[in-house]
């Protein structure tokens, strides 16, 4: 039995009655032990122990509340947190810096930024932990500009300050800003000591690198870890696996996974299984799952099965998907989450089993959410099932009235069947409601710099050269037999205008830039925010053969690995 567990075991009414003379020191230890052993079954909450302490007329000291306040960490706990704050004021402990920082963290965790700001403003001398707490509070709340303003006002900063803001940028989806801030952290600053990133900083930066496909920057972070002999534990190892896989370097991800050796746990296995699923390597997924559950005797968790079911989706393996879904429940006692149900609906839809998908949704023990209806909409769109599309869209709009993707999907179904009046009506409805279509966007990294391209982009410094290169590429493709797949243009245009519209998709601009800027034979890695269209998919296959380039494209669904004229997805995506 651990020391903390032993303390909790004795924290009972008999113990208290027999020891009426307990000092605050021992009460504080009991409170801290309960808070730190949240996963253990307990007969007493921290607040009940505090109240019992007060019943014995023992006064709290400046250690009591920093131990007690972390037990209030979500909006439901706010009333208790406020009453505890009143106790702090009653005993005159509100000026203590440790108590003040704990109050800031409590209000932040409970989502009460106004009270957190008030505690900060009322502080006479604001120490570094208080500054860090308030910056973290705004960053976690998504108010990243306010967090940055406070960060810039700080009289001094440490690794926690930088890490809080970098993590805030990542949480807000501002990955380039996160990497820019990390680079700023490395620069020498007048009158400020050099701040070395810690494990949390590096795992956060690796996440940003993965999102942007910034492989070179991710490799630099890995080299930094090795240079300073930072131990690659499960958290950092999993972050490296995820980064390398998302950047299109699966072999490096595998090397990190294998290097973990005996440290591999369910998190590491789940990360690797999810990575293999993104690449459509279903057989390797199944093999690794078997190794995990038999050779290493590690039980899978819900994340593991999200990866396994995702692998089934990418290959359209309906029987295997149903088998693993059943195994999850019956063999491992895991209650399916909405993500698991979403995978199954997606699997049924991609397999053309729309009626089965609808029956499966009807059998769910929870209300279907945006993920479920979106999966049904996507599957029925692939089959041109307009009636099911319309029904799914109606449910989606009820749950998320501003979901542009739903409108666009239905509009695309109408466009493919030539129902231009319905397309016009949907676009008019989007305009009236102020719903904007998410533009196609692609990222590439060249010489350590991430470049962003949007459809029809002319903002690049070398736009003229990029478009000239793209024209040259398309001419070579046409000479090799390429014919534009104009059915992918879901606009009421003539054939010539459709060809022009297709030629300026963001991934085509990105590949032209890479062919212009990199040496022959250099692999090309592109991150796309939307699903790659059929015409761009065909273009990538042909470029990989004609220009002898390995091309890796990560779209919103999966990875496409183009080599010598073929794709790893086998044209199923």
Curated annotation (Swiss-Prot):
Gene3D superfamilies named among the record's database cross-references: Tetratricopeptide repeat domain (1.25.40.10)
Region of interest (Type E motif), ranges: 372-447
Gene Ontology process terms (BP): RNA modification
Pfam families: DYW_deaminase, E_motif, PPR, PPR_1, PPR_2
PPR repeats: 23-60, 61-95, 96-126, 127-161, 162-188, 198-232, 233-263, 265-295, 301-336, 337-367
Spans annotated as Type DYW motif: 479-573
Record region (Type E(+) motif): 448-478
UniProt entry keywords in alphabetical sequence: Repeat
InterPro entries (UniProt xref): DYW_dom, E_motif, Pentatricopeptide_rpt, PPR_At4g14850-like_plant, TPR-like_helical_dom_sf
Family indicated by similarity: Belongs to the PPR family. PCMP-H subfamily.
Protein name: Pentatricopeptide repeat-containing protein At3g62890
Chain's gene name: PCMP-H82
């Amino acid at each position: 039995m651990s020391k903390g567990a032993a303390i909790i075991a004795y924290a009972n009414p008999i113990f208290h009655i027999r020891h009426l003379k307990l000092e605050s020191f021992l009460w504080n230890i009991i409170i801290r032990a309960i808070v730190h052993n949240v996963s253990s079954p307990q007969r007493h909450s921290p607040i009940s122990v505090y109240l019992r302490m007060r019943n014995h007329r023992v006064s709290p000291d400046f250690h009591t509340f920093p131990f007690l306040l972390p037990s209030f960490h979500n909006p439901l706990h706010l009333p208790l947190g406020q009453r505890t704050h009143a106790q702090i004021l009653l005993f005159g402990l509100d000026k203590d810096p440790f108590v003040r920082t704990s109050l800031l963290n409590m209000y932040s965790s409970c989502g009460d930024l106004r009270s957190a700001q008030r505690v900060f403003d009322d502080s006479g001398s604001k120490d570094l932990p208080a500054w860090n707490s308030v910056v973290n509070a705004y960053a976690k709340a998504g108010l990243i500009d306010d967090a940055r303003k406070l960060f810039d006002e700080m009289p001094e900063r440490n690794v926690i300050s930088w890490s809080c803001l970098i993590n805030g940028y990542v949480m807000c989806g501002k990955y380039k800003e996160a990497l820019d801030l990390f680079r700023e952290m490395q620069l020498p600053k007048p009158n400020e000591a050099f701040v070395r990133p810690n494990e949390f900083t590096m795992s956060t930066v690796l996440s940003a690198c993965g999102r942007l496909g910034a492989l070179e920057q991710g490799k630099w972070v890995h080299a930094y870890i090795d240079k300073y002999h930072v131990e690659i534990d499960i958290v950092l190892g999993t972050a490296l696996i995820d980064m390398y896989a998302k950047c299109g370097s699966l072999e490096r991800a595998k090397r990190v996974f294998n290097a973990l050796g005996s440290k591999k746990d369910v998190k590491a296995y789940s990360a690797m299984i999810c990575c293999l699923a993104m690449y459509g390597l279903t057989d390797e997924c199944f093999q690794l799952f078997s190794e995990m559950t038999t050779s290493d005797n590690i039980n899978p968790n819900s994340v593991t099965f999200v990866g396994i079911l995702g692998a089934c989706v990418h290959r359209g393996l309906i029987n295997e998907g149903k088998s693993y879904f059943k195994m999850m429940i019956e063999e491992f006692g895991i209650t399916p989450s909405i993500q698991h149900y979403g995978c199954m609906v997606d699997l049924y839809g991609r397999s053309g089993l729309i009626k089965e998908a609808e029956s499966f949704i009807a059998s769910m023990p929870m209300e279907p959410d945006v993920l479920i209806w979106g999966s049904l909409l996507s599957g029925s769109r692939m089959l041109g099932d307009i009636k099911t599309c319309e029904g799914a869209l109606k449910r989606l709009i009820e749950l998320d009235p501003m979901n542009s993707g739903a409108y666009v999907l239905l509009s695309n179904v109408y466009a493919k069947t030539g129902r231009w009046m319905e397309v016009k009506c949907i676009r008019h409805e989007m305009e009236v409601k102020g719903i904007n279509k998410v533009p196609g966007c692609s990222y590439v990294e060249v010489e350590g710099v991430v470049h962003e391209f949007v459809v029809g982009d002319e903002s690049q410094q070398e736009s003229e050269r990029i478009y000239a290169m793209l024209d040259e590429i398309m001419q070579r493709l046409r000479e090799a037999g390429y014919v534009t797949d104009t059915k992918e243009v879901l606009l009421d245009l003539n054939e010539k205008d459709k060809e022009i519209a297709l030629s300026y998709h963001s991934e085509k601009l990105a590949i032209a830039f890479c062919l212009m800027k990199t040496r022959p034979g250099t692999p090309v890695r592109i991150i796309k925010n939307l699903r790659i269209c059929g015409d761009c998919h065909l273009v990538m296959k042909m470029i990989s053969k004609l220009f002898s380039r390995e091309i890796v494209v990560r779209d919103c669904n999966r990875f496409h690995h183009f080599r010598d004229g073929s794709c790893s997805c086998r044209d199923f995506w």
